[in-house]
Amino acid sequence: MAPKNNRGKTKGDKKKKEEKVLPVIVDVIVNLPDETEAILKGISTDRIIDVRRLLSVNFDTCHVTNYSLSHEIRGSRLKDTVDVSALKPCVLTLTEEDYNEGTAVAHVRRLLDIVACTTCFGPSPEKSDSVKSAQVKGGGKNSKQSDTSPPPSPASKDTVVDEAGETSHSFPKLGSFYEFFSLAHLTPPLQYIRLATKRETEDIAKEDHLLSIDVKLCNGKLVHIEGCRKGFYSIGKQRIICHNLVDLLRQISRAFDNAYSDLLKAFSERNKFGNLPYGFRANTWLIPPTAAQSPAAFPPLPVEDERWGGDGGGQGRDGSYDLVPWSNEFAFIASMPCKTAEERQVRDRKVFLLHNLFVDVATFRAIKAVQKVMAEPVLAEEDSEVLYSETVRDLTVTVTRDTSNASSKVDTKIDGIQATGLDKKKLMERNLLKGLTADENTAAHDVATLGTISLKYCGYIAVVKLEKESEELSPPSQIVDLLEQPEGGANALNINSLRFLLHKSSPEQNKKTPQQHDDELTSSREFVSKMLEESIAKLEGEEIDRDSIMRWELGACWIQHLQDQKNTEKDKKQTGEKSKNELKVEGLGKPLKSLNSSKKKTDVSSPKTPQTALSSQVDAVSSEADTAASLQSDAEKNAQENVLILKNLLSDAAFTRLKESDTGLHHKSLQELVDLAQNYYTEVAIPKLVADFGSLELSPVDGRTLTDFMHTRGLRMRSLGYVVKLSDKLSHVQSLCVHEMIVRALKHILQAVISAVATDTDKIAIKVAAALNMMLGIPENVAATPHNPWNVHPLIFRWLEKFLKKRYDYDLNAFSYKDLRKFAILRGLCHKVGIELIPRDFDMDSPAPFRKTDVVSLVPVHKTFYFKSMQQAACSSADGRQLLESSKTALDKGKLEDAVTYGTKALAKLVAVCGPYHRMTAGAYSLLAVVLYHTGDFNQATIYQQKALDINERELGLDHPDTMKSYGDLAVFYYRLQHTELALKYVKRALYLLHLTCGPSHPNTAATYINVAMMEEGLGNVHVALRYLHKALKCNQRLLGPDHIQTAASYHAIAIALSLMEAYHLSVQHEQTTLRILRAKLGPDDLRTQDAAAWLEYFESKAFEQQEAARNGTPKPDASIASKGHLSVSDLLDYINPSHNAKGKESVAAKRKNYILKLKEKSKQSNVSEHLVEIPREKQKEMSEEDTEETGSEEGKSSEENHETILAPVEEPPSPPVIEDATMDNSNPITSSDVSTEPQHPDGSEDGWQPVQRPRSAGSYGRRMKQRRASIGKVYTYQKKNVEADIDNPLFQNATQQNDKYYILKKRTASYSSYADHHSPGLTTQGTKFGRKIVKTLAYRVKSTQPSSGNAKTAGETSEEDGLKTDASSVEPPTLSSTVQSEAYHTKNSVVSLGKSPSYKEVALAPPGSIAKYQVWVPQAEVSDKQEDDEMEKKTEQGTSMELTRDEQMITGLEEEVKKEISADPESNITQGEEEIKVELQPSEGVLGGSHINENDESGGGIQVEEQVEVELINDGVTDMIHSTREQQVIDQLAADSEDLKAKLSISTTDSGDASRGLLPNKKLSASAAPFNPSSPPSIIRPTPIGMNIGPSWPVNMTLHHGPPPPYPSPPTTPNLMQPMSFVYPPPYSQSVPTSTYPVTSGPFHPNQFPWQLNVSDFVPRTVWPGCHPVEFPPPHMITEPIAATVLEPTVILPTDIDTSGVEETKEGTQDVAVADEVMDSVNHVNNAVARSETENGNRKSEEGEKTFSILLRGRRNRKQTLRMPISLLNRPYDSQPFKLGYSRVIRDSEAPKSVA
């Protein structure tokens, strides 16, 4: 074998190199035998076993089982451990392998498994009307997704379902539990497959014949098939052999082919990314519907069907490992070297495999022993304590009867008194010392705990443990080395597969009448009542025992707390130093200061002796000092004795760890340690837990997660009552604790009932049903009384009241019965007792909700399996868990790169120890997915989360909290990938499970409500979304308080949603509440408070604008709600509950159509100068807020689909130099004071201040915002004279209506105005404005600046150049800068420099997201002229407002020319009439409205800047070809002008930086700073915040940060979806990341956008104007240096050889074209700039069609002409082909053209 190429490198070098390698997505191509290929999305860290897993969830290959993979270089039959990254190229070949009997049977089982979803999971929601209302709650499939012919208007139907479903606090429908997985509306491809007796056939050799099967197809045809080594062979007319059964049946039967194709299509529609609904196991307390139909037989799911080689998982089922020398094996592993991480990983792997094998074998032995006792009545009826015991090699199995008195509790803890044989005191000391000295090897070295299991089964308790530990260390039997982990750790032991069925299919049982069943229930109820009375009597005489045993985790948490506290004290450096001779007693902390002994107090007084010696009481002080010295000597003596005692009790290594912890605890005696630990428990541990609950750092959703959180902190469940007392302001925590106490109290009743009838198993079902009816039903003829305020059975209430008071010290009367969630109690009871029920909608309001047939079976309750196998978690990998914790911490601090690194290493360790598909690894997949999600790598995050979900569903259970969390997280990832309907399906599944577990009154549920609202708005169901938002707000108010920052976030979400509906008065009301809460909680200086203030000012400005529009008579589309003024939140329900008929899609479309027709008619009748109606500004705001990052579009999208472009938010550091972060920032300099960037969408922002509506609500108001214009970044420099030039010349009026070549330039003037101060709030007044007129269907705005005479710009003048940000959006443009209000612009004239920022007023008035963080400086020579400002405002307010409502492709704008007088002082930097403009263009693709410069060649005219025209392209079917042609010409002209301007002005950028450094910066708040969640909990858009049990001790916090963009383009966008845009903080600053809310998925939904890549042209619609041929555009050219996450803006970039093409154009052009020297200079500048950008970009795509561009030329007498030419010429020789030339003339309004022809 060839040597490794890294043998010369040191170990450290290897490590450093490995640390830098992060996982990336790779495409794995697998060549299939049918000469097709499957492209799999893998990750660079995958191995061949992962490729096999990907093939199993691929639609085309999921039926293929027996194969090998080969590589052209690595050879054939690659092992599962081969890394995919080592395969170059990553192309594999799938080779079919010969079958043996086992693999042939497994192949048949796979086919049965794939088709099981059509029959095993009950009715699908599409076909079942009875469960329509539960469809949403059950997360059932949307009919759009899974039905082959979706209904015409599913959105409206979903609206009805939603309004009646999730938001109505109704209890979940258990009958729809499995609908999420059901495809029963499809025809099953086959009816059955039966194993037949082997049939002899001549075509198959006897030794090759494996099996014979009979297959009945969907059409009723019975097919006989023989299985052989080469494949499957059909007998009959068609003798065909195929390697796999599916291909054979497809060739035999067209009906099967069609049905199977429909099934695969349904798989794809259900989830195109995978998560196929097969491979499930019956591992949930609700059994599959197919088993519920015949509970006596309990037909298994295919995976567990023993007839086809399936089983319940695990190893040792056949007894092959019973004789393993367990003691010797465990002892050997405990002695393995473990000093380094590599050694521990090897050791942990062996411990993990051995312990899992031991648990499996011990469980099987325990079940067999219990079954033996149940089968022998003599053993079962014995009165002895031990009913049965046996010894198998090293294992001892003991069976005892569970107690039949509910008040008695049997100790079944694997480390309890019964198991260890120690008394309570000794056990407490043992556990405390174990915790204090715990390290990463503790679990592996604790052989006694590893070698013990305990389970309860059918009323019996079985304990299996090692008989003795090996005294002599003999060599191991190598059993661990021979162990193989099948399927990468998947298919672990399903404890539910060991169920005991309670029903027998006897004829007598089936013949019972309903009356007989009622009699059985009555007698059983009496039996339970009698047992309850006895238990209550015994419980009343029980003494309260508060001192339970101490968990060893408490010691570990305590010492960690002491060390953290000591580190904090070191940082603060205590002011007073202790005496050298003082005995240190450290780490007690403030809560434990009272524990300091009198010795300690005396010691503390010793340092004061020198100070008091100066007094006259010298003798007294001397005696005191002597006493202190003697006491100190006694303390030192006692400490030395304590050290000796601890040394004897602990090993040398353990004592050394305790001593080196630097806490001083090694000086304490055992009793002192116990007392200190108890005080830490009461005064620190439990309050800290409650504090974590209150801050939502931890958010348990059920008893399982609550228990995990408490146990991993060493807290006993007996302390639940104390937790409730401390959680007086956390009603959801109190509810969870009370429910858990009730479940534990009722558990004892059920266990006692089962134990009492254990000898007669036929009665167990009816007795359990009767007990459940008493617990959860409403008794007949029993009314609530003061002694029984609950409407439950009196005995049940008495039991609960006594039990909770005795065991938990909690008064049940303090809890309201109406808050009782019976389904959560039922679920908890089934988990704790081991009951399996049929999935039926139980009527909890009836006296008898449960029948005998509802209770199907009993399953073992395993101490290691419950709470997600705590013991297995302990011996998985301590290093891996520590890395997970480090990843979580790095994520909290915003260090995304470190978080990814730690998470990747943690996953690698857990995969190496546990296997890639073990249940323990799923938590690491989920965490890493969350981290990658925050970096913006949504694709890779989705892959990891899908892995986690697949594992959790199959290994942990369909309702496990981790499974629930995976649903919510995956929904968020799908939403970010623009698959809204798919995301909605999964988030509703998560919501259904949340309702089942924690109910509607929980912060996680409130967060999920907002998630659903966001996705519903994405689908146009705005009213449903508002209902969810309202629910979320009320929930947060009730649970967290009206002044919680999470509640403020809810107010903000509603404010955003209302603003999208143009209900600005309501937005103002809600944002005022938001701001009030944030100011009180966070202070006015917090960024979140400032952002809320900016939002409020924006809303106020829009409300004012709306009032002005109403005063002017402009109709508002949202008058139905906005006109109502300030409504309370609850008043919204009148609007939120619309008439379903009126809000249907048909009526919406009709309204929109009528609205459009009216506008068209009005536009045609109007004159250009007369009918200029103001467009509702909020339309532009709404559409601009919908503009989010496009992640790609499907190739086949019609021209009606939106082509969205993104302008990245600007980030500027406080210092002048531009600093760009390639991984974290989307930044390009924008320096206009009026720049309007892409609006900062609240849901694409930092830390959860995200609006719920990303997409526009297309179906809500019946309008699609067809006419929108870009917000143009501009710098106004006005002269003092304001010239109003109206279009009075009839030639001009005609020119605007005919297809001529004249465009009118109007003049405007204005004066400078200074910026407001940063801290000036509420500056919402309208500034100076100027009117805009429509010129035909097209106009463009012009601003002038004066050039310096002679040279264009000198170094002295270019102190810092202003920037003009050109911006265009072909469909959904960015918002107009909010300084542009209604018909006028608020002019702010100030010199804007890179690295500076605008005023707070400027920012606050701008829509959030439209202004970036930069700074403003005002030269001293620039003095604001207030009079000029006022004059300008008066004049411009007389202008006519503008109506942008024309046809589908109307292009609007305004062209203005302002003449400036040249300053007389050539030395001044920047005069009042002059500004220098620097153009910084984002790389773009699409249509550009450009900016151009017109320089006077002889007469010295001013530079003329034409701002771009934003092209609005929304197609509704009608195309105006004439207008399109006209618009194309102007756009082409402006494109050329933009490049000219850019080339001319970008030259001075290098000189301008130094001049501005001496100016004082004035930092401003950016309204584009996405108002992020002010709270640590998720606010607006968060994944379902489910507590993740990676191990409950590793809660992972999810906060919002930015990272590098994903390397692959995203899938096509969902139509009408508004893409998110996120804000990036400057490099010197970072967002303060609060401790997050929920354990893994605590982050908000939209931390980051998925930026476009340079191949964006492959995903945008090809046709720019509807009805035209596709117009192609050149690839983007980066003018600025490339940024990783740059968002593309559509623009036409001039080609590199434009100068030569200009000459060619002159030769072929018209006589009017005159090329001036200035034009040639500008052309050369453009050439240089574009050439540089091409070099920087380095990635140009081939041009596929014709493009044209325009050049504005200026000749003699200032005649301006536009030269238009095809770009294709520029890349060919001069004589390649002829071309046509089109040009346009631009004239002033003072010039009357001679003709308009």
Swiss-Prot record:
Q: Where is the composition biased (Acidic residues)?
A: 1184-1193
What SMART domains has UniProt attached to this entry?
A: TPR
**Which GO terms of the molecular function aspect are on file?**
mRNA binding
Keywords for this entry? Cytoplasm, Nucleus, Repeat, TPR repeat
The UniProt disruption phenotype note reads: Reduced proportion of the cellular volume devoted to chloroplasts leading to an abnormal chloroplasts distributions. Inhibited far-red block of seedlings greening associated with reduced levels of chlorophyll and chlorophyll a/b-binding proteins of photosystem II (e.g. Lhcb1.2). Lower levels of chlorophyll, especially in plants lacking REC1, REC2, REC3 and FMT/CLU.
Query: Could you tell me which residues the TPR repeats occupy?
Result: 880-913, 922-955, 964-997, 1006-1039, 1048-1081
Give residue spans, biased composition: Basic and acidic residues.
Answer: 565-587, 1171-1183, 1194-1204
Write the protein's name. Protein REDUCED CHLOROPLAST COVERAGE 1
Q: Which organism is it from?
A: Arabidopsis thaliana (Mouse-ear cress)
